[in-house]
Each structure stands twice: as structure tokens, then as C-alpha cells.
């Protein structure tokens, strides 16, 4: 026979766990208010959450509903209705509450407020029996298990083991100490107290671990910790303490002011700073055994005479422990003593040089550092040759300045000015990253895109200059020169480029013969492309000699001419009337062209009205809206499971296949073998109406028709 109150009791337990945040696996944020809940409960009550968790299984730790027009008050009441089937307080607007429930697609939406009140009355009867059994302690919303036999026994066992949580005045405390004497307890109660004190008070850590399945648990709030140090730090700031702790703290402060606790200060002075913090806290916490030893000095020989005196001394020690507070003392900071245990290492410039990329390069500070300048030696044949010769020695300060100027990563004022570029059409100063977007948004009729590199340029002189430079080789020798006039001279005189390359090779030889001795360093560390200095201007491929470049360029130009001939054959489809001004791509409809512009601007202009998420494509937004509505595009014909994406649906259909079966990825029809699938695939091919050629894609069939049959007719 099923118990009618079991379901309501389980829901009550889940609601308690939700309030504690225990085992909650999702967090719902509405503005700046966060609600913790369980995915299983949300998916069982709401179709919206069920579909959302199905499609976002790996990224649903936190869900933001701030853009869904649901207030935090309504969602709090919805959570109460999900967990309990009722609401504790009436909403300010029931219509708004009902709209929020319909928006979240709850399975059971009440028609009026009286339905929830009736459900409240009926469920209170069921939950009353369950709540009557919840007199035991609950940790994180979970009721602790207790043995019914032990619970029906003497309550004195629990009274002796657990400290009282009431506030005791000094008069009541004296009366309690007098009531703990030997004559006030019956004989059976002594045995119970003795057993409980031996089993629980002797080892409080074991008592805590048996009560909750962890090592150290706070007796006030029930939070568990993995080590005792964390428990000690938590006890000092626990906000769920009993009321009697404030009273005992007050008496403790009074005793300290009166000078009664001078022995505690002496104990702190005897402590060595080398001992660990856990040992200090064990010393000052005052275990029951230590409290018993302190109380034994006051009781005298009565402690060792009888068992009854032991019980009385233990109870007195418990009363004394209530007066005691935990004092956390930190050892004095003595940096000079602590630094004795550390080895101080001095970092020199040599260590810094060894930590760089060129580990094999060793600097010798005793040798001078020379500047090199270019000198032209004119021979008999009047052929100019540029060599590197030392001009003058450089001091250490100048040498450091030169080395700081060498790395290309160091930013200069010129580079900082280059980051902010100005628009050539309107003069607006913006960053280079936003310059392309500015041209597309404001001056789209005056700009165009380069056909080789795709860079956005202004029509006119800028386009002509870029067309001349685009595709030309750019070596490190060009980048190394700081003057633009020298760059133009080198472009006009290509013979000097080879001479400068020879100059860099000779510079490497001079470095090898001089004081630095960099024999182990390859040439490519200082000049990356010195082994292959010649480069093809069309494809960018590098060669060692000039003859190889000439031979390669003849074949490379022929290939380009062949490609251009193919491009002339494939003319534009005249049915595409909407073309992009930047890249020249054509479209059948204007909306497709407007959507294509987002490829250049990278602007997500399609925004979801429900959650505010932005998308680059309109079809992505349509698919996202279907997820909000719970409308699946693909439905399994076997198990009726819905999927929003095609590849997810294909992957699900594959799970239904048996050995040897295959599936058509177009219509999702299952076939027993591959032969029948190949015969079936002819149905999905696009056939040319003139020659009968078949293609997998429609665009392939259209391009075939335009290339082969459009000109003939």
C-alpha cells in the first residue's frame, strides 16, 4: 500500500535542499538576483527548461533570464509552485504570474489563485505528517537518519551528550552545577551518562564524523570541512551560533578584564613560533580531556575515588568550557629570523642574457662594442662595393641604449600614432581596427576591396598605389630601413637589393671573425631568409639563385594566364541582379546581399528578442527562436525525439541502426544495405534537363547549365 504523503515529503526535502543550495546543479539569474535549483525538477515541471537542458547539456551551469520579462518575485513563486505545488504568499499580480508560467511552458498552470490555495490546503494535510517527523536535525536540507529504537529510549542520553542551547544566567548556572551532583541522579541514569561520555565526549572528532559523513563539521550550522584548520577559522565567523554564545562571550570579556585569565597569556608566551597553527588551536580550543584535568585540580582526590565524581567533574568542565571563547593568536612577524632559512641569490646581467632565446650567445663586457657604417670601396672596374667597418667604440651607457632600441617589439611614438588613423573622406580619427567598419558604414559608395588581398580601399589614388604594391615581395631588408626615401630608391634600383643582401652576409662573416664568436649560431637567426633571398612576386615562393626565380616566373605567369582564361569562360550569371560592391559576389535577392555584408563588417545585426543574443546570419536567429518555442525541425520517426540541428538528428538516427543497415542523410530513410542506398540516392540528385548530367548540389547543376548550355541557346 503506497503512502500518500511520501511524494509531498520528498518534494519538501528537495525544497529544503534548494534553500540550502545543496546538490543544486544550475543557477538562474534575473537581474542581480540568483536562484539555485535542480535541473531534474525544472525539466519535470517546464517544457522550456526541458528543451533548453537537452540542447545545452554542457553549458547550463548558469542561465540568465533577465531579458525574458519575468520578475524575480514571479520566478520565486514559480519555484515554490514547482517544488511544493503551492505558493507561500499571494503574488502582487496574478495575471503577470500566470503569463510568466505560460512563458516558461509549465505543464500545470492554475486558472485562478483559488486553485493554488486549495492545493495549499490539501497538501498541508499531507505535509503535516511529514513535517511532524522532521524534529530531528537537518543538514543542507537533508534530514539526518536516526534509529527509531534509540530514539524511543531514554531522552537523558541525548540530554547528557548534547550541550544546552538556552541562555544561562549566573544564578541558573550555579543551580545547574548543583543539580549535577551525585545525589540528584538516579542509578540507571549514571550508566547512560557514563556510556555516552565515554563514547562521545572522549573523542569529539569521532562524534562529529559519525554525525555527518565528513571529518570535521560545525555543530552550529552543519557545514563540513576537510581539515581542522578550516573548521577553526569557520567557528570564529560562524553566523548561526546559539544565543548562549553571546552570553558566554560577555562573561569571558569580563574575566579577562579582571585578570583571571593571566594563565592564558602565559601559555601564549611559552609557545614557539615554529609550531604549526593546528597544534596551537588544539592547545587553546580546550578539549574535554584538558578541561577535565583543569577541573580535577579543584575537586582534589574525589576525582580518582569514585566514578560519580568523574561525571560531576566532567559536567563542571563543560560549564567552564561554555564560559571560554576561542582566542586566535598569530606569531609575531620577525623577518630577520625568517630570512635565515632562505638562500639569497643575486641575479646578474649574465643570467638575464642566458634566459633569452639565444642561449648560446655569451656577452663579454670587457670587449668594446663598435658601431658599423657603410663605406663604398671603388675598385679599378668602378664597381661599387659596400662593406661594414668599425667607426668608433661605444660606451656602456650608449651600448645599453642601443640594445634597448634593437628589439622590434618596443613601441615607438610613431607606432602609437599609427594606431589611431584618420578617415581620408571625413577626417574622423579612429583606431585602425574600426577604420574598415567606418568606411563600410559611412562611405560604402566611395570604397572598394582589393581582389588579391581583400583590403578595403578608397577609390582613386589609394587604390592605384595599393594595386602597384600588392603582390610584391617584402623582405627584411626593406623593413629594416627606417627612411621611406631609401625604400623608394631600393625599389627603383633592384641591383642594389642584391648588393645589400651580400652586405648582410659579409656582416655575418665580420661578426664571426670579431670578438663575439657566434660560430654556433646559424645565419637564419639574424636574417631569416638569407639562405633564399630571391622571391617570386606572384606566389611568394623563395629561391637561392636568381636563375631559379626566372625559370619559375615563366611557368607561374602561364598558370595565371590559364586561370584568367577560365575566369573569362565562367561569366557572371545574368539572373543574379544584386552584386556586392566590395567583392563582386552576386545574389538573387536583395535580402541575401544585405546578409552578405555582415561577412565584411562582422556585425551581428540579427538580435533575439527573447534573450538578446546576437547572430551573424538570419537563419541562425530562426533556429534559435525555434529553440525558445520548443519547436523541433527534425523528429525521429521511431521514438519521436526532436532535434533542432540536422547533424544531431542524423547522429540520433544512427543509434537506431542495426548491424549492416545504413541511413540516407537527406531524407533519413533506413536501408538494409549500401546497394539499396546507392539506388535511392539517385532520387536526391539534381539532373540537367538538357544533357541528363546529375549533381549532388543544386548550385553545381546551375553552374554546369550556365557554362555548357546557356551560350549555345
UniProtKB/Swiss-Prot annotation:
Gene Ontology, cellular component aspect: nuclear body; nuclear membrane; nucleoplasm; nucleus
Gene3D superfamilies hit by this protein: Classic Zinc Finger (3.30.160.60), Potassium Channel Kv1.1, Chain A (3.30.710.10)
PTM annotation (Phosphothreonine): residues: 356
Compartments, record wording: Nucleus; Nucleus, Nucleoplasm
Pfam families named in the record: BTB (PF00651)
InterPro entries: BTB/POZ_dom (IPR000210), SKP1/BTB/POZ_sf (IPR011333), Znf_C2H2_sf (IPR036236), Znf_C2H2_type (IPR013087)
Residues with the Phosphoserine modification: 355
Gene Ontology biological-process annotations: B cell differentiation; cellular response to UV; chromatin remodeling; DNA damage response; DNA repair; innate immune response; mRNA transcription by RNA polymerase II; negative regulation of transcription by RNA polymerase II
Biased composition (Polar residues): 275-308
Chain residue ranges for the region called Disordered: 160-179, 270-320, 384-416
SUPFAM superfamilies: beta-beta-alpha zinc fingers (SSF57667), POZ domain (SSF54695)
UniProt entry tagged with the keyword DNA damage: yes
Residues of the BTB domain: 24-91
Entry keyword Isomerase: no
Zinc fingers (UBZ-type), renumbered ranges: 533-558
Outcome following mutation: residue 326 to N: Reduces sumoylation of Lys-328
Glycyl lysine isopeptide (Lys-Gly) (interchain with G-Cter in SUMO2) crosslink, residue number(s): 3, 200, 205, 260, 265, 275, 283, 303, 316, 328, 340, 346, 381, 528, 563
Post-translational modification: Sumoylated with SUMO2 at Lys-328 and to a lesser extent at Lys-265. Sumoylation inhibits its transcriptional repression activity and regulates its subcellular localization.
Effect in UniProt of substituting residue 539 to A: Abolishes binding to ubiquitin; Abolishes recruitment to DNA lesion sites
Keywords: Differentiation, DNA damage, DNA repair, DNA-binding, Immunity, Innate immunity, Isopeptide bond, Metal-binding, Nucleus, Phosphoprotein, Repeat, Repressor, Transcription, Transcription regulation, Ubl conjugation, Zinc, Zinc-finger
GO molecular function: DNA-binding transcription repressor activity, RNA polymerase II-specific; K63-linked polyubiquitin modification-dependent protein binding; protein heterodimerization activity; protein homodimerization activity; RNA polymerase II cis-regulatory region sequence-specific DNA binding; zinc ion binding
Zn finger intervals (C2H2-type): 216-242, 448-470, 578-600, 606-628, 634-656, 662-684, 686-709
Entry's free-text remark on domains: Both the BTB domain and C2H2-type motifs are necessary for transcriptional repression activity. The BTB domain is also necessary for oligomerization and efficient sumoylation. The hydrophobic cluster preceding Lys-328 enhanced sumoylation efficiency. The UBZ-type zinc finger domain is required for targeting ZBTB1 to UV damage sites and for PCNA monoubiquitination. UBZ-type zinc finger domain mediates binding to 'Lys-63'-linked polyubiquitin chains (in vitro).
Binding partners and assembly: Homodimer. Homooligomer. Isoform 1 and isoform 2 can homodimerize. Heterodimer of isoform 1 and isoform 2. Interacts (via BTB domain) with TRIM28 (unphosphorylated or phosphorylated form).
Function: Acts as a transcriptional repressor. Represses cAMP-responsive element (CRE)-mediated transcriptional activation. In addition, has a role in translesion DNA synthesis. Requires for UV-inducible RAD18 loading, PCNA monoubiquitination, POLH recruitment to replication factories and efficient translesion DNA synthesis. Plays a key role in the transcriptional regulation of T lymphocyte development.
Protein name as annotated: Zinc finger and BTB domain-containing protein 1
Source species of the chain: Homo sapiens
Source lineage: Eukaryota, Metazoa, Chordata, Craniata, Vertebrata
Originating gene: ZBTB1
